[in-house]
Amino acid sequence: MQCALCLVASSPPPIKRAVVARAEALPAAIGAQLLPRMVAWDAQHMASALAALRVPLLVIQCTCLNADRVRVSIEPGDDTPWLATLRRFAPHARIEVITAVGHFPQMEAPDRVNRLIEAFVADL
C-alpha cells in the first residue's frame, strides 16, 4: 500500500492505522490515478512553482527515502534531494526538521508542528 510508505518504523500504531484506513477508504479508481499525477506534477512544475513564490514559506521536513527506497526519519543537518531543491529554487524558505516522525507530523507531533508554525507567523 502506497500510504504505508509514508510511515516510519517509529510511527505510532494508532497513527499507522488511521493513515492506512483513510487510504483504503479512497476509491481504488481515484487512488490509482492520484499518485502518478501528483508525482508527474512535481516533476513537471515543482521547480518553477517554488521559484515563483514571493511570499514567506515554511517547510517542515521529517522523512526521506533512503537508498533502499525505505522511508526514514531525517535529522537536522541531513541533506535530501527535496531539501536541495528547496534551497535551489526557494532560497528564502524557512526549513525546519522534526525528527522521529513519519510523513504526517501534524498527526504524530502536533505540538511540535504548532510551535513551528506559531514561531514562523510571529516572525512575519
List where the protein language model places each region:
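Conserved alpha/beta-hydrolase catalytic His-Asp/Glu region
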Residues: 1-50
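Short, intrinsically disordered/low-complexity patches at protein termini
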Residues: 25, 54-57, 119
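Surface-exposed alpha-helical segments enriched in charged/polar residues
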Residues: 36, 48-51, 84, 118, ...
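Acidic-enriched, low-complexity/disordered segments with a strong bias for Aspartate over Glutamate
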Residues: 42, 68, 78-79, 111, ...
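Residue-level signature of transmembrane alpha-helix interfaces in integral membrane proteins
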Residues: 43, 72, 115-119
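Alpha-helix boundary/capping detector
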Residues: 45-49, 61-64, 112, 121
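Conserved loop-alpha-helix segment in the C-terminal half of the alpha/beta-hydrolase fold
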Residues: 54-101
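Catalytic active-site module of serine/aspartate enzymes centered on a nucleophile-bearing elbow/loop
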Residues: 88-124
